[in-house]
C-alpha cells in the first residue's frame, strides 16, 4: 500500500506553546540541507515515514514502503515480471521517471549500485536488502537535488536512516502468509544498545533474519491457467506442436496425446485452434501456472553503530551494515522448451510433403524429483557498507566538522537454469529427428531433409534425460564505491535581521567500480536460446559542495547551494556544475510559502560507458537504395520492401563519449498549520530534462548515410566519416550492419502536484484520533526520444506508458488505553487496458479503453499486553482485492493483468510479538 506522506513540518508545528517559536527549538540537520536549523520544514518539501508508520500500515520492507508511496506513480519490473534482467531485485520509479533518477542514501551517504542492469541497460539501486526492523525513519525529497547530493538526484532523494539510540534490548518475531496460499514468511529481529557509565561510549547493534516462501501462479485462480475471461475462448499453450511452413499446424501423433496425458498434473490432452492447419496439438491449460509471482527469500542483515567521545570537541563514529540475500524464482515452464527452428531452421519431411518445425515444452514431471522447483533460478547477493570518521567542533570556534570514510561493496551471483545447445540438439537428433537425409527441400532448394519419428516426439522424457542437457549458468558481478568526505559547517556565520546565517562546505573524493562477468557458456554460444553481455570499468570522482542559508529578515530566508562534480574515466573527464536558489517566506507563524529553482544531472553510469558490444536483428529503410530508385526520404511507401524494410544485424554498446543528463528543476508550494496537530502541504514541481541516454537510431543513421552518399552533406566531413564507420554495406551496396551505441539525445518535460493533510485530536478518555492523507498528480509528462520527433504525451498515450496519472492514500489511527489501531487505504487512478498498450493507435484501437481506479485497504491493531510487551495483528489487502478484469486480453494470455501496476497476491495476515527488555 502507498507509503503515507507525513509532513516533517508537523513535528515542529505540534510543539507545545513553550516551544512554538523557531528560535527556541533545538537545531537539527534534516535531509535536504547541510546546515543545522530549527525550522524542519524548509524550501525543499520533505516527507518522513517513521518506524511506527511502517509497522502500523503493514509494510514488510523498505521496498514495500517506497513502491507504495504516493510519489511512486511509475510502474517497475520486479518478481512478477517474468524473464526480465533483474527479477530478483526491487526498485522504485518516482513520478514515472526512470528508477536510476533517484539518489538513495543510507544515513546520508550513497548506497552502492546493484551490479545487474535494470531492463538490461540501466544502472539502479536494489532496495530489498535493508533491514526494515532496524530503520528509524525514511525521508523522501521529491524533485531535483543535485546541488547538494550530486549525480542521479533528478526525480528525488531517498534517505534511509537507521536506528542510532535504544533504551534497551528489543526482540521481535513475526510470521504470516496469504489467504490464497503461498508466501508464508517468518522474520526475527534482535537489537540492543549500550552506553558506558561515563556516557562517552555508545554502541547499538542489531540482527534481522527473514524467510519467505514463493507464491506460485498456480496458487491463484487468476493466474493458474491461461486466461479464461478474454475476448477469445481460452487458448491453451502448445506444449507439443508440429508447425508447417505453408499450412500451419500438422498433427502427427498416432496416440492423440495419450502418451503425454500424465504431464502437468494429468492435464495434458488434445487441443484445438480453429483455422490453424490441422488445428490440433497437445497442450495443457495449466502450463501458465508454473511460474512464481513472488520470489522465495532467505536473508540476514547485521548492523552496528558506535560513537566514542574523545573530548568535548571530538567524537569518533563508525558503523557497519552487512546484508546477505538469496532469492529464488521461476520465469515459467512455458519458457523451458526446445524447438528445431532455433538451430536447424525449417526442415523438409518427404513423408509429410512440407517444411515443418518441432516445438515442445518440458513438464514438471520431467524436470526432477521436486518438479518445477528443480528448475528455479537463484540470485545470491552480499553487500557490506562500512563508515568511520570523526566529528566535532574546531576549538572554541563556531565551526563544526565531519570527516569520514565510507566503503560499499555489492556482490551478486545469478545462477540461471539453462539448456545446453549441443546436448539438447543432439538428444532430439538421436531420439526424434534421426540422421539428415540426402538432398535439400524441393520448395526452396535450401532446407535440410529429415524423416523424424513423430511417435517418439510425442513422448515424455525421463528426468535423467532432462538432466543430460540442462544445468545452470552462473553470472558474477560486483560494484564498489569508496568515498572520503570532509564537511565544515558554521550555523552562526554572521547575523542578519531574521537570525544567524549558516554555511556548509563539503569536499568528496571517491572511486567507483563495476564489473559484470557472465558465465563463459553464455558468451560463447553454448547455451540454447540465451546469451549475455559482459562489461566493466572504474572511475574516480570529485565533488565540492557549498550551501549558504540566510534569514534575510524574520519572514524571509534565502538559501543558495552550488556543487561541482567531476568524473575521470579512461583518461577523460566528465564534469558538471549545479546550483539552486531557494526561498522561504513566512507571512505569519502558521504559513510557509516556499519556492526553489535549480539544476540537476545524472552522470553517465559505468554501464553506459563500459557495457560491451552485443548483437541484435532489426529492419530499417535503406534511404540510399530507395533514392536510387526514385523514392526520396518522406516518399518511401512504394519503395520495394527489399529496401523499405531491409533486414540488418545491429550492434549496440556503451559509449565513452557520453555526456551528463541535464535537468532544470523548480518547485513552489506552501505549508499551512492553523492549529495544533494540523498541517496542509501543497507543492508544484517542474522538470525539464535533456540529453537523456538512449540507443542511437538506426533509421537516423541510414538517413544520414544517404545524405552523405547523395552529396547533401560533405562526404569528407567528420560527420560523414563517422556515419560511414557505423553503417556497413556489402559490395552490392546493401546495408549489412549498423552500429547503434548509446547517445545523449532524448528529453522529458514533467509537471506534478503533491499534497498532504494531517490532523489529530485528543478525545480524552475516548482516545486519540489522527489522520494523514497524501496525493500525487502528474499534470503533464512529455517525452521526445530523438531530435525532430513529435513529443509523446506519456499521460495520454498508453502505447508508451501505462502509469496512472494520480495516486493517493489515507490512514486513520485510533489510540485508546493499551490499544492502537490503524486503517490504511491506497488508491490510484484509471490505467490503460491491454489492448490500448499494444497498438500505436492507443485508445483508438479495437477493444482499447481504461480500467477502473483501484483501491486496497490495510488494517492493524496493536495491544500492549504488559510493560514492554506488544502484540500486533496486521491484515493487508483486507478485502482480498485482485487486479481488475481486463477483457481485452486474449484467451492465450498467461496472466491477464498489468504486473507493473497490479499484483495477484491477495489478502495477507501477519502476527507480531515485540518485547522490550528492561521496561
Residue ranges, per PLM feature:
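N-terminal Sec signal peptide and the immediately downstream disordered periplasmic leader
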Residues: 1-69, 189, 193-195, 312, ...
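N-terminal periplasmic accessory domains that precede
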Residues: 62-65, 90-93, 125-128, 152-173, ...
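Extracytoplasmic beta-strand/coil segments of soluble accessory domains associated
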Residues: 63, 67-110
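Short acidic/polar hinge/loop motifs at secondary-structure boundaries
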Residues: 109-142
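Surface-exposed, low-complexity loop segments enriched in small/polar and acidic residues
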Residues: 119, 221-230, 259-297, 303, ...
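Short loop/turn motifs that connect adjacent beta-strands in outer-membrane beta-barrel proteins
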Residues: 165-168, 197-200, 311-314, 393-401, ...
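C-terminal beta-barrel architecture of Gram-negative outer-membrane proteins
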Residues: 616, 767-864, 879-880
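C-terminal beta-signal and adjacent terminal beta-strands/loops
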Residues: 679, 690, 779-782, 826-837, ...
Amino acid at each position: 500500500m502507498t507509503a503515507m506522506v507525513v509532513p516533517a513540518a508537523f513535528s515542529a508545528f505540534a510543539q507545545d506553546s513553550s516551544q512554538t517559536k523557531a528560535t527556541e527549538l533545538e537545531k537539527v540537520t534534516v535531509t535536504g540541507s547541510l546546515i543545522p536549523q530549527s525550522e524542519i520544514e524548509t524550501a525543499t518539501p520533505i516527507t518522513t515515514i517513521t518506524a511506527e508508520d511502517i509497522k502500523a500500515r503493514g509494510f514488510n520492507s523498505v521496498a514495500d514502503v517506497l513502491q507504495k508511496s504516493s510519489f511512486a506513480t511509475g510502474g517497475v519490473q520486479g518478481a512478477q515480471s517474468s524473464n526480465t534482467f533483474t527479477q530478483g531485485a526491487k526498485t522504485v520509479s518516482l513520478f514515472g521517471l526512470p528508477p536510476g533518477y533517484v539518489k538513495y542514501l543510507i544515513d546520508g551517504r550513497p548506497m552502492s549500485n546493484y551490479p545487474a542492469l535494470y531492463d538490461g541497460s540501466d544502472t539502479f539501486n536494489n532496495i530489498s536488502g535493508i533491514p526494515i526492523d532496524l530503520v528509524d525513519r525514511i525521508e523522501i525529497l521529491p524533485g531535483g537535488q543535485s546541488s547538494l547530493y550530486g549525480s542521479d538526484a533528478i526525480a528525488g532523494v531517498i534517505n534511509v536512516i537507521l536506528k542510532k539510540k535504544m533504551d534497551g534490548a528489543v526482540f521481535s518475531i513475526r510470521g504470516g502468509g496469504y489467504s490464497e496460499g503461498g508466501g508464508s514468511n517468518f522474520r526475527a529481529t534482535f537489537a540492543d544498545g549500550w552506553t558506558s557509565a561515563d556516557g562517552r561510549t555508545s554502541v547499538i547493534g542489531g540482527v534481522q533474519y527473514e524467510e519467505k516462501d514463493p507464491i506460485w501462479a498456480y496458487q491463484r485462480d487468476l493466474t493458474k491457467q491461461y486466461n479464461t475471461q478474454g475476448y477469445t475462448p481460452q487458448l491453451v499453450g502448445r506444449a507439443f506442436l508440429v508447425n508447417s511452413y505453408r499450412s500451419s499446424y500438422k498433427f502427427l501423433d498416432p496416440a492423440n496425446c495419450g502418451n503425454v496425458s500424465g504431464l502437468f498434473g494429468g492435464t495434458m490432452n488434445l487441443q484445438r485452434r480453429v483455422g490453424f492447419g490441422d488445428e490440433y496439438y497437445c497442450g495443457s491449460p495449466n502450463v501458465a501456472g508454473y511460474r512464481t509471482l513472488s520470489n522465495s527469500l532467505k536473508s540476514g542483515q547485521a548492523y552496528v553503530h558506535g560513537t566514542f567521545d574523545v573530548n568535548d570537541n571530538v567524537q569518533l563514529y563508525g558503523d557497519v551494515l552487512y546484508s546477505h540475500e538469496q532469492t529464488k524464482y521461476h520465469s515459467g515452464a512455458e519458457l523451458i522448451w526446445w524447438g528445431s527452428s532455433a538451430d536447424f531452421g525449417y526442415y523438409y519431411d518427404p513423408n509429410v510433403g512440407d517444411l515443418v518445425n518441432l516445438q515442445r515444452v518440458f513438464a514438471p514431471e520431467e524436470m526432477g524429483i521436486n518438479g518445477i522447483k528443480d528448475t528455479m533460478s537463484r540470485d545470491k547477493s552480499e553487500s557490506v557498507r562500512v563508515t568511520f570518521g570523526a566529528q566535532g567542533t574546531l576549538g572554541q570556534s563556531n565551526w563544526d566538522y565531519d570527516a569520514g570514510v565510507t566503503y560499499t561493496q555489492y556482490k551478486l551471483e545469478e545462477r540461471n537454469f539453462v539448456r545446453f545447445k549441443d546436448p539438447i540438439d543432439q538428444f532430439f537428433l538421436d531420439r526424434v529427428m534421426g540422421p539428415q537425409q540426402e538432398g535439400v527441400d524441393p520448395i526452396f532448394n535450401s532446407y535440410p531433409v529429415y524423416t523424424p519419428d513423430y511417435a517418439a516426439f510425442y513422448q515424455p522424457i525421463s528426468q535423467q534425460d532432462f538432466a543430460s542437457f540442462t544445468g545452470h549458468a552462473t553470472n558474477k558481478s560486483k560494484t564498489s564505491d569508496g568515498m572520503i568526505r570532509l564537511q565544515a559547517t558554521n550555523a552562526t556565520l554572521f547575523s542578519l535581521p531574521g537570525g544567524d546565517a549558516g554555511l556548509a562546505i563539503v569536499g568528496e573524493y571517491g572511486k567507483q567500480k563495476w564489473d559484470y562477468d557472465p558465465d563463459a557458456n553464455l558468451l560463447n554460444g553454448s547455451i540454447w536460446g540465451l546469451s549475455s553481455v559482459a562489461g566493466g570499468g572504474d572511475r574516480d570522482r570529485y565533488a565540492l559542495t557549498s550551501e549558504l542559508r540566510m534569514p534575510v529578515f524574520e519572514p524571509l530566508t534565502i538559501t543558495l547551494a552550488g556543487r561541482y562534480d567531476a568524473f575521470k574515466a579512461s583518461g577523460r573527464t566528465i564534469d558538471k556544475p549545479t546550483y539552486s536558489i531557494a526561498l522561504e517566506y513566512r507571512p505569519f507563524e502558521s504559513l510557509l510559502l516556499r519556492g526553489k529553482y535549480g539544476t540537476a544531472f545524472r552522470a553517465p553510469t559505468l554501464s553506459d560507458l563500459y557495457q560491451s558490444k552485443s548483437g541484435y536483428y532489426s529492419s530499417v529503410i535503406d534511404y540510399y537504395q530507395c533514392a536510387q530508385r526514385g523514392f526520396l526520404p518522406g516518399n518511401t511507401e512504394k519503395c520495394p520492401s527489399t529496401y523499405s524494410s531491409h533486414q540488418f544485424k545491429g550492434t549496440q554498446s556503451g559509449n565513452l563519449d557520453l555526456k551528463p543528463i541535464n535537468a532544470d528543476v523548480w518547485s513552489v508550494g506552501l505549508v499551512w498549520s492553523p492549529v495544533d496537530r494540523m498541517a496542509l502541504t501543497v507543492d508544484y514541481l517542474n522538470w525539464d530534462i535533456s540529453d537523456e541516454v538512449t540507443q542511437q537510431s538506426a533509421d537516423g543513421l541510414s538517413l544520414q548515410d544517404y545524405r552523405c552518399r547523395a552529396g547533401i552533406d560533405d562526404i569528407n566531413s567528420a560527420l560523414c566519416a563517422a556515419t560511414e564507420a557505423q553503417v556497413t554495406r556489402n559490395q552490392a551496396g546493401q546495408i549489412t550492419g549498423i552500429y547503434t551505441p548509446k547517445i545523449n539525445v532524448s528529453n522529458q518535460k514533467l509537471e506534478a502536484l503533491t499534497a498532504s493533510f494531517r490532523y489529530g485530536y485528543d478525545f480524552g478518555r475516548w482516545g486519540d484520533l489522527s489522520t494523514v492523507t497524501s496525493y500525487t498528480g502528474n499534470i503533464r509528462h512529455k517525452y521526445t526520444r530523438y531530435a525532430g520527433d513529435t513529443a509523446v504525451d506519456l499521460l495520454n498515450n498508453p502505447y508508451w506508458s501505462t502509469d496512472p496519472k494520480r495516486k493517493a492514500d489515507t490512514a486513520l489511527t485510533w489510540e485508546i488505553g493499551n490499544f492502537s489501531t490503524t486503517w490504511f487505504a491506497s488508491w490510484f487512478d484509471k490505467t490503460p487496458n491491454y489492448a490500448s498498450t499494444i497498438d500505436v493507435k492507443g485508445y483508438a484501437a479495437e477493444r482499447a479503453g481504461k480500467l477502473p481506479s483501484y483501491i486496497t485497504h490495510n488494517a492493524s491493531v496493536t495491544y500492549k499486553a504488559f510493560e514492554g510487551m506488544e502484540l500486533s495483528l496486521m491484515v493487508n489487502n483486507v478485502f482480498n482485492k485482485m487486479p481488475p478484469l481486463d477483457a481485452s486480453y486474449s484467451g492465450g494470455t498467461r496472466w491477464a493483468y498489468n504486473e507493473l501496476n497490479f499484483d495477484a497476491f491477495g489478502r495477507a495476515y501477519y502476527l507480531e510479538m515485540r518485547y522490550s527488555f528492561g521496561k
